[in-house]
Swiss-Prot record:
Belongs to the asfivirus inner membrane protein p12 family. Induction: Expressed in the late phase of the viral replicative cycle. The chain crosses the membrane at residues 16-36. One of its GO terms (cellular component) is viral envelope. Not glycosylated. This is Inner membrane protein p12. It comes from the Viruses. Keywords: Disulfide bond, Late protein, Membrane, Transmembrane, Transmembrane helix, Viral envelope protein, Virion. It is a single-pass membrane protein. Homomultimer; disulfide-linked.
Length: 61
């Protein structure tokens, strides 16, 4: 990633874009590897689960 030759404002925008992409990827990975397993752990049997818009959780009895 050589920055020489780029305009003054260009490198700033590039850096912000890269940071934004990394944050989005981290958020997606956090969602899939941390949040989804937690949602699934809440209910072990199908009859104990309530599913709403694709997110399942333990029925509140």
């Amino acid at each position: 990633m050589a920055l020489d030759g780029s305009s003054g404002g260009g490198s700033n925008v590039e850096t912000l874009l890269i940071v934004a992409i990394i944050v989005v990827i981290m958020a997606i990975m956090l969602y899939y590897f941390w949040w989804m397993p937690r949602q699934q752990k809440k209910c072990s049997k199908a009859e104990e689960c309530t599913c709403n818009n694709g997110s399942c959780s333990l029925k509140t009895s």
